[in-house]
Amino acid sequence: MPVSKCPKKSESLWKGWDRKAQKNGLRRQVYAVNGDYYVGEWKDNVKHGKGTQVWKKNGAIYEGDWKFGKRDGYGTLSLPDQQTGKCRRVYSGWWKGDKKSGYGIQFFGPKEYYEGEWCGSQRSGWGRMYYSNGDIYEGQWENDKPNGDGMLRLKNGNRYEGCWERGMKNGLGRFFHLDHGQLFEGFWVDNMAKCGTMIDFGRDEAPEPTQFPIPEVKILDPDGVLAQALAMFKKTEEGD
């Protein structure tokens, strides 16, 4: 008795095209309609693995790790230099979900760069910033600004050690006037010293010492006086 066989279902034409168009593994240049192109690894039709993306509009180049279509892992971002026309590195470090996250180095100019921690493409955590004028800040960051404990070392050697908030000196801190041989210790509000004490500090080694030394002041409880002055200042601020 003859046995009938069911004919195999043929794959529809559009499904075949779609299957063949799915990008997996290493591919050469794949162009987007806007002129951007990518060279590297794919998975399930998205960038995944090692690859290089070039953006036509601004000439930016990213080389590094990708995960499910986004920059994720370690990578380097470069931009064309407006003066030379050549690409220069602007960021090298870690990424997560298409944003700078983890440890990385950002170059703002030939003599200005940041090295430290990032979160959501903003400086956040511990980091060190080298400014073009020669100043150096080292300490905590939040929302792309110094925030927390940190030290600012000026080009002339003077330095501030203490609390920061919103990118400004706020709270208790010490300012070493090493050029004049003096030390100020007190309380700051938005970069302004509001109350504190000034003493001689390394005056004999200072390149430009003050004409006269600060006389020794005999106070029974200098810390208590400073604490009282600070409390009065805070009370005044709250009243405003």
UniProtKB/Swiss-Prot annotation:
Residues 206-240 are annotated as: Interaction with TP53. It holds the Pfam family MORN. Gene3D superfamilies: Histone H3 K4-specific methyltransferase SET7/9 N-terminal domain. The keyword Lipoprotein does not apply. Residues 76-100 are annotated as: Interaction with SIRT1. MORN repeats lie at residues 38-60, 62-84, 91-113, 114-136, 137-159, 160-182, 184-205. Residues 6-35 are annotated as: Interaction with MDM2. Keywords: Cytoplasmic vesicle, Repeat. It is found in: Cytoplasmic vesicle, Secretory vesicle, Acrosome. One of its GO terms (cellular component) is acrosomal vesicle. Assembles a suppression complex (suppresome) by tethering SIRT1 and MDM2 to regulate composite modifications of p53/TP53. Confers both deacetylation-mediated functional inactivation, by SIRT1, and ubiquitination-dependent degradation, by MDM2, of p53/TP53, promoting a proliferative and cell survival behaviors. May play a role in the regulation of spermatogenesis. PANTHER family: MORN REPEAT-CONTAINING PROTEIN 3 (PTHR46511:SF1). Interacts with MEIG1. Interacts with TP53, MDM2 and SIRT1; the interactions mediate post-transcriptional modifications of TP53 by MDM2 and SIRT1. This is MORN repeat-containing protein 3.
